[in-house]
Amino acid sequence: MAVPKRKTSPSKRGMRRSADALKAPTYVEDKNSGEMRRPHHIDLKTGMYRGRQVLTPKES
């Protein structure tokens, strides 16, 4: 069984764990509707994606 030869310092432990943090999702403003949406996702209000109609718009 593998056993560490040296104790891992708090600095090294923290550097290893720095990649585990949850990042807030990014949002962009839609050019057509002005609504906030995730990048590379369909705008659910208008049903548009990359200038094409891919879904029927939601009725509000």
From Swiss-Prot:
One of its GO terms (biological process) is translation. Residues 28-44 have a biased composition (Basic and acidic residues). GO terms for molecular function: structural constituent of ribosome. It holds the Pfam family Ribosomal_L32p. One of its GO terms (cellular component) is large ribosomal subunit. InterPro entries: Ribosomal_bL32, Ribosomal_bL32_bact, Ribosomal_zn-bd. Keywords: Ribonucleoprotein, Ribosomal protein. Residues 1-16 have a biased composition (Basic residues). The keyword Transcription regulation does not apply. Residues 1-60 are annotated as: Disordered. The keyword Endoplasmic reticulum does not apply. HAMAP family: Ribosomal_bL32 (MF_00340). Belongs to the bacterial ribosomal protein bL32 family. This is Large ribosomal subunit protein bL32. The gene is rpmF.
